[in-house]
Amino acid sequence: MLRDGNKQSKNNVRFVRKSIKTTVKTSLQNRSSLKKPPVGRSKSRSISSIPSSAVASTLSLPEKVETKCLEEDTQGESSSSGNKDPTTKVLDVTAKPKSKRRKSFTSLLVNGSKFDEKNGETTEPEKLPSIDDESNQLEVAEYVDDIYQFYWTAEALNPALGHYLSAHAEVSPVTRGILINWLIEVHFKFDLMHETLYLTMDLLDRYLSQVPIHKNEMQLIGLTALLLASKYEDYWHPRIKDLISISAESYTREQILGMERSMLKQLKFRLNAPTPYVFMLRFLKAAQSNKKLEQLAFYLIELCLVEYEALKYKPSLLCASAIYVARCTLHMTPVWTSLLNNHTHYNVSQMKDCSDMILRFHKAAKTGNLRVTYEKYINPDRSNVAVLKPLDKLPL
């Protein structure tokens, strides 16, 4: 009986101890749950002396976390926390809700590169109107920038040909001018396209810059260049017998075909060149030109074809300068616009020397010996632009 009573008392003690532990554990859980913020609210807590590895792991979490490092007073915070280290930092970690759209790294770089608008340092580019008609499929507005990027690149890679005749013993700038003046007349008689004329001059000069020739071959090379250009650019090309006839039977069919093969081989079949014509088309659109401005600009650039001096300038600069001189001659204001500056890549100061040269050609056109271009543009179909009085000098 005594043993049974001792066993029962021991069991009662164990039951009481077990119930006490359960009660204490429950109270501790309730106390810790009171410290937790309600679900759905953003939680903020201060963490003292977090190692850099922990911060890196926190930033790599999927949720966006904004971390701010605050320097605390060494006496205030360290005394309360018991930390005596004066370099103690407190990190305020605030959890933010996920954004629907993540920002790309490029957008962050762009935003970081902007100047402060409050300091007035922003340099936002001027919004210029488009010069392309996207509704017109023939203008290939989707590809026009890529096309002209090719022309700009090709022009930069091709050196200027302003001194190539110094290597020729029998060909002079005067001889070249006479040949080109005659080719302009032949081109006009055959009623070929503008593109054909400018490509003819490009093929002629490129070939002469690479191959030494005799004086009696000049006309043969000119006619062959015209034949190649018309095959590449025009709807039709002159027959070889017509070219022989217009040269007063100076050459045979075999000679023309042989020169055609020689030119193609020497030029490596590269016929798509950045001629002044392709730049003129684009720049006139940027100038929002009327017919008179267009005809005068083409008249001035065609005067440059005959002059060997003009070869020292790039085709794009020649076209931009021709439009500038034409606008000044017609007293248009402003003489140069932001749209022209954007599409030509030239400002007025960069065109000064070239513009002065073109104005000199304009003054001499009426009384010069090579008058085919002057007589061509004195026609009413070309707005009689050749009769316009040249300026005494260009505005500063």
From Swiss-Prot:
**One GO CC term, this protein:** nucleus
Which parts of the sequence are annotated with region: Disordered?
1-98
Q: Does the keyword Cell wall biogenesis/degradation apply?
A: no
Q: Which UniProt keyword terms apply here?
A: Cell cycle, Cell division, Cyclin
Q: Name one GO molecular function term.
A: cyclin-dependent protein serine/threonine kinase regulator activity
The cross-references to Pfam families, in alphabetical order and at most eight, read: Cyclin_C (PF02984), Cyclin_N (PF00134)
Going by the entry's taxonomy, the superkingdom of the source organism is recorded as Eukaryota
- List compositional bias (Polar residues) regions by residue number: 21-32, 76-85
An example Gene Ontology biological process? G1/S transition of mitotic cell cycle
Record-linked SMART domains: CYCLIN, Cyclin_C
Which InterPro entries does the entry mention?
Answer: Cyclin (IPR039361), Cyclin-like_dom (IPR013763), Cyclin-like_sf (IPR036915), Cyclin_A/B-like (IPR046965), Cyclin_C-dom (IPR004367), Cyclin_N (IPR006671), Cyclins_cyclin-box (IPR048258)
Query: Low complexity compositional bias: what residue ranges?
Result: 39-57
Q: Which family does the UniProt entry place this protein in? A: Belongs to the cyclin family. Cyclin AB subfamily.
Listed name of the protein:
Putative cyclin-B3-1
Protein species of origin: Arabidopsis thaliana (Mouse-ear cress)
